[in-house]
Every structure is written in structure tokens, then in C-alpha cells.
Amino acid sequence: DRPVCRLEDMKGLKIRVQVASMMGDTVEALGAEAVPIAYAELYTALESGTIDGAENPPVSYYYNKFYKVAPYYVKDRHTYTPGVILVSKITWKNLEKEYQDALVQAAKETQEYNRTAIEEADQKAYEALEKEGVTILEPEDPQAWSQAMEPVYRKYGGEYLDLIEKIRQIR
């Protein structure tokens, strides 16, 4: 029940994470305690004080009514969840080339549409959350948050460290 704008504000908070070591390491790098809890138990865990916060896209936060038990939302942009199309190697090999080409083309054509649709849905969710009385915050010093993530980048970045650096330079 307190706002989080500075990296120091994370200290001592219990943050729900998925049962995945990278997410736990991410939360701990920010100074909080990572608490693995099933998504189905998230509302109750917030309500009871078992945890102090969790990560959620704005649409999920709104539709699951987490704002009733967690009145602050921090737009920290710590992750981007892409939509992906997966096809097994066996299935792909069994498709005729024209169908493979059609699937690849359809995926390319829907990329921008999906990004735009997600951005619009997020914006509508933010507006609805503000109407519900949610305080929407942004980190005061995003660079400090990013620097705190260095150990996580090194641990999990592996062969992608150069790509991570290129992305940083673009920002």
C-alpha cells in the first residue's frame, strides 16, 4: 500500500513472481524479495498481505480487479511479452511450401496490428484504472533500475549480451 517510484522503494517489498529463476533474480536485483505464487492465488495474496506487489500488464491488472487490493501501478517497462506462433518441426515439414509461405506472410502482416492493438488496449486499461482511483506511477530514475539489472543481464544474457547493448544504445 505504498507507491514505488525510486529503486530504494523496492527494498523490503515482497513481490510475487512466476516460478522461474530469472524472474526471481530480477526482483531480487531490484532489492525486493521474490515470492513464487501461482497466478490463481495472486488476488488473495495481495489482499492478505502475503505479498506487497506483483507484475502484470495493465489489462490483466484491470480485468482481474487487482486495483482493489493494490492501488498503485508502476509503469516500469521491465518486460515486453511478444505473441509468438509456434509450429513443431514435424508439422512444418509436412506443410506444403505454399502454406508455409502463407503462414510466414500472415505473421509478418499481423505484427504491427498486434503491437497497435496491445498499445490501444493498454491505454484504455490505464484510463479505466485512473477512473477506479489507481495511482499510476513511473520510475523517477529509470537508469538506476536498468543498472540494478546488470547482474541479471550477465547471468542470463549469455551470447546475447552484444544485442542487449545495441538495444540500450538505441534507447
Regions found by a protein language model. Give the residues of each.
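N-terminal secretory/targeting leader peptides
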Residues: 1-171
